[in-house]
Amino acid sequence: MHNEQVQGLVSHDGMTGTQAVDDMSRGFAFTSKLDAIVAWGRKNSLWPMPYGTACCGIEFMSVMGPKYDLARFGAEVARFSPRQADLLVVAGTITEKMAPVIVRIYQQMLEPKYVLSMGACASSGGFYRAYHVLQGVDKVIPVDVYIPGCPPTPEAVMDGIMALQRMIATNQPRPWKDNWKSPYEQA
């Protein structure tokens, strides 16, 4: 090895090794603060897209109304285009014929995207044990938060959204999303 290369390991641009590490760590601190600011912005500006097929969709409408005011948690206006939304709220029964449609909607959403399964029908098929009903939307798309109930109360929906916001704020890893392959995905 050349003498300059060996010397470059010890010092950088005429600084001692500790000075170089201090200067480099300042850049990392800035990056971590920037990540925290981005997470704060994502947490407080969720744009939900409701996919309501049953009574849970009616409950979601009441949560979006003035009595419960979901806007104070950052979910201001429901979006009806997947390209403008980052939170897919699946509220109601999902049948086998609906599955390719919901997968396509999920694929059209921009990253980062989140899925909230609202109610017993979306989470586990509900009381329908028929051949045409999916036993949970997590069979076709990855779900971040499950909200129990038939239908869930507006307070439970708000708790589910706040749980999702806590997950976003802490940058929790989502391994179920990274390795997900849906049986309905198009190549």
UniProtKB/Swiss-Prot annotation:
Oligomeric form and interacting partners: NDH-1 is composed of 14 different subunits. Subunits NuoB, C, D, E, F, and G constitute the peripheral sector of the complex.
Any GO CC annotation of this UniProt entry: respiratory chain complex I
Biological-process GO terms, alphabetical: aerobic respiration; electron transport coupled proton transport
This protein's record includes keyword Magnesium: no
Enzyme Commission numbers on file: 7.1.1.-
Subcellular location: Cell inner membrane
Native organism: Bdellovibrio bacteriovorus (strain ATCC 15356 / DSM 50701 / NCIMB 9529 / HD100)
Xref: Pfam families: Oxidored_q6
Disulfide bonds: none
UniProt keywords, alphabetically: 4Fe-4S, Cell inner membrane, Cell membrane, Iron, Iron-sulfur, Membrane, Metal-binding, NAD, Quinone, Translocase, Transport, Ubiquinone
Name of the protein: NADH-quinone oxidoreductase subunit B
MF GO annotations: 4 iron, 4 sulfur cluster binding; iron ion binding; NADH dehydrogenase (ubiquinone) activity; NADH:ubiquinone reductase (non-electrogenic) activity; quinone binding
InterPro entries attached to this UniProt entry: NADH_UbQ_OxRdtase-like_20kDa, NADH_UQ_OxRdtase_20Kd_su
Cofactor note: Binds 1 [4Fe-4S] cluster.
Membrane topology qualifier: Peripheral membrane protein
Cofactor (UniProt): [4Fe-4S] cluster
Annotated function: NDH-1 shuttles electrons from NADH, via FMN and iron-sulfur (Fe-S) centers, to quinones in the respiratory chain. The immediate electron acceptor for the enzyme in this species is believed to be ubiquinone. Couples the redox reaction to proton translocation (for every two electrons transferred, four hydrogen ions are translocated across the cytoplasmic membrane), and thus conserves the redox energy in a proton gradient.
Binding annotation for [4Fe-4S] cluster: C55, C56, C121, C150
Family: Belongs to the complex I 20 kDa subunit family.
